[in-house]
Amino acid sequence: FKTGLVGFLLFGVISLNAVAEVRLLEGWTRSPPPGVDRLAIYGRLVNDGDTPVVLSRLELAGAGQVMLHETVMDAGQMRMRHIDPIELSPSKALVMAPQGLHLMVMGLARSPQAGETLTIKATTRLDEVHTFLVRVQPITALGPVPN
């Protein structure tokens, strides 16, 4: 019995330590113009774990979809390309910035205003859930406001 209990406890500790910590650093967005139901989120997605993490689902309450997009030049036109799945290597950052990678939020039920904080829920292929906080900046913002 003691051996089984010790094994169970060790397995539980090992399992807890195996969960990767995925964070969004300096997450920010601009308040969208009136009548626009979408916005782009920027920042650095970081996997602090020892193994790769694949994000399979992103959600924001009151929005239809959240997806990773890349802005690319195609035949002289700037276009957004959907990237799926979102793979995060250990100890590396996925940098999201204007005119590059970004989380695209579409189908907003209402426009968030400057000063609000949005919460993105990210689910991995292993059903681990991470939450990311995103600060809403004025429409004229060029980057995140320091804390």
Regions found by a protein language model. Give the residues of each.
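Compact, glycine-rich, soluble single-domain proteins
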Residues: 21-147
